[in-house]
Regions:
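Conserved beta-strand hairpin/beta-sheet module of binuclear metal-dependent hydrolase folds
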Residues: 1-44, 153-169
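Active-site neighborhood of phospho(di)ester-bond hydrolases with catalytic His/Asp-centered motifs
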Residues: 10-14, 59-64, 83-84, 142-145, ...
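Solvent-exposed loop/turn segments at secondary-structure junctions
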Residues: 15-17, 65-68, 88-89
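Short, solvent-exposed loop/turn and secondary-structure capping segments
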Residues: 21-22, 72-75, 93-94, 176
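Active-site metal-binding motif and surrounding structural segment of the metallo-beta-lactamase
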Residues: 25-83
Length: 201
C-alpha cells in the first residue's frame, strides 16, 4: 500500500483470497500443472492485521492485468481501478486469454473504472507522464510491451530515496543496467510485444 495525504492506493494487488477458484475455474489441467504459485498473506488480510478496513484503499493501479497482479481486485469491490485505454481495449478482447489473463478477476460489475490519461510532459526518459497527486511524489509512466498498456510508477520520498516500480517489464534490475530482455522462453510466453519491451528497457 502506498500512503499519501491525499489518498491511499495499491500498485498491483498480488494474489487474492479467491485465487484457488480463479485458477481452477479458468485454467485447463495442463495449464494448472504449469502455473505455480504460493499463497502468502493477502493484501486484504494485511490491512485487517494492521487495523485497517478495505475501504481504507481509495484506488488501485495495476501495473498490468496478468493474473498474478490483479487477483485481489475482487477483494475490493466498488473501488476505483485505474487502466490505460490500450490495456482496457485488450484485456476484454478475445485475444486476452488464460493463463496470462483471467477475466473473472477483473470483469466485476462493481468495479469503478478510471481511465489513465498521460500528459505530454516528459519524465526521465519517458515522453509522457501523470503526476498522480500533482506534487511530484508519485509519477506514472507508460511502459508498454509486457502487456498492451503496462504502467510503471516512480515513488519519490521526502528522504530523497526514489523507487521505480516496473511491474514485469523485467524480472531483474540488471536487465535495466545492461540492458537485456527476459530469457527467450518466458519472453515468448508472457510478453505481448517484445519490440516495445526492448524500447522500454
Amino acid at each position: 500500500m502506498i500512503e499519501h495525504p491525499k489518498g491511499n492506493f495499491f500498485f498491483d494487488t498480488g494474489l487474492g483470497t479467491n485465487i484457488d477458484l480463479q485458477i481452477s475455474n479458468n485454467l485447463s489441467f495442463f495449464a494448472r500443472s504449469v502455473v505455480k504459485y504460493k499463497k502468502l498473506t493477502t493484501v486484504k488480510r494485511e490491512l485487517s492485521e494492521n487495523g485497517l478496513l478495505s475501504n481504507s484503499i481509495d484506488f488501485i493501479i495495476p501495473s498490468h492485468y496478468h493474473w498474478d497482479h490483479v487477483s485481489a481486485l475482487s477483494d475490493f469491490p466498488n473501488t476505483n481501478v485505474w487502466i490505460t485505454p490500450s490495456e482496457d481495449n485488450y484485456i476484454f478482447s478475445s485475444e486476452a486469454k488464460a493463463p496470462n489473463f483471467i477475466k473473472e478477476q477483473y470483469n466485476s460489475k462493481t468495479t469503478k473504472w478510471k481511465t489513465i490519461k498521460f500528459n505530454p510532459i516528459p519524465y526521465e526518459v519517458f515522453t509522457e507522464s501523470l503526476d498522480i497527486f500533482n506534487d511530484g511524489s508519485l509519477i506514472l509512466v507508460p511502459v508498454s510491451g509486457h502487456t498492451e498498456g503496462s504502467v510503471g510508477l516512480f515513488a519519490n520520498l521526502k528522504s530523497g530515496k526514489r523507487y521505480f516500480f516496473t511491474g514485469d517489464v523485467t524480472w531483474d534490475v540488471k536487465a535495466f543496467q545492461r540492458p537485456s530482455e527476459k530469457h527467450i522462453i518466458p519472453r515468448k510466453q508472457v510478453d505481448h510485444n517484445t519490440e516495445l519491451i526492448e524500447n522500454t528497457i
